[in-house]
Amino acid sequence: MSVIKMTDLDLAGKRVFIRADLNVPVKDGKVTSDARIRASLPTIELALKQGAKVMVTSHLGRPTEGEYNEEFSLLPVVNYLKDKLSNPVRLVKDYLDGVDVAEGELVVLENVRFNKGEKKDDETLSKKYAALCDVFVMDAFGTAHRAQASTHGIGKFADVACAGPLLAAELDALGKALKEPARPMVAIVGGSKVSTKLTVLDSLSKIADQLIVGGGIANTFIAAQGHDVGKSLYEADLVDEAKRLLTTCNIPVPSDVRVATEFSETAPATLKSVNDVKADEQILDIGDASAQELAEILKNAKTILWNGPVGVFEFPNFRKGTEIVANAIADSEAFSIAGGGDTLAAIDLFGIADKISYISTGGGAFLEFVEGKALPAVAMLEERAKK
């Protein structure tokens, strides 16, 4: 990968626009999982230390584009950064026609999705972003798969476009896991978004020695084996695809599950065989026997790629499956890479961050890289490096 790296540049006195991934969960105005901000801090601190005039921005949530909405403001992120940095930090809401930044100051530019044209990679908006800076730093691996104005368009028009340390490290670590993995390689794909991940399973089936499915994805595989999944989240139209994958690769399907009659934090969990799920029940976690089977597989792995929980771990009664799997990954001697928002939240919850070899900040980008797709933001940086 040939891109200009931020670490190769002298940023003193330069106006530096960092596109970070600060899309973190917020509750009651407070950041509830800071993994992505923590990952971005070294990049911000490096630019400040060099005496740059630093601007940082991100998207947060899914507001209606072009409209300000306090619920999706970056203010909670700004308050978090004020606690962590000794430098002055301020939030600027209207910045498209220019913003004054002092050396050693951090200006957080409000949620890019409040700007009309952001998601469509609008050229006029991209040029306005580019006019704010001398150096554009793309450091948001989590959005590198989207061609948007703040991740892609700006890079075409900025004087200099480079990869931040976090983005560069992500690409190196993922390259190591996917190009020449130590074997056996085990890939875990969980979470609720089944349709978006079946193509990933297909790609991974060609690289991994063992695939593991969890969450809503596992329910589709349970249905593919002819079991009733009741009111569980699954995708009936993808059952045939799941059947095909079951014939072409080794995928352990849960033999026991935890169910409830409602999707709620207080719903009691019932542990039962996968054969006994009733019409009014929904599967919210894998059972103990299934979790132990997966733990055994993970114990013997040499490379582990982890994307997504195996149950609704946010609810204490349906946490055990993900906890057993997470601890098995933490205890394994394998080179482990974990990615995706829910996965990061699980790592935080179980306190195992220091036992994972590499934690990727990307969700969709992580999966698209795994699929072997070109990431638009990375392709743009490679193109700019040739000039």
Curated annotation (Swiss-Prot):
It is found in: Cytoplasm. Substrate binds at D21, L22, N23, R36, H59, L60, G61, R62, R113, R146. Its EC number is 2.7.2.3. It catalyses: (2R)-3-phosphoglycerate + ATP = (2R)-3-phospho-glyceroyl phosphate + ADP. The modification N6-acetyllysine is found at K84. Monomer. This is Phosphoglycerate kinase. It comes from Shigella dysenteriae serotype 1 (strain Sd197). The gene is pgk.
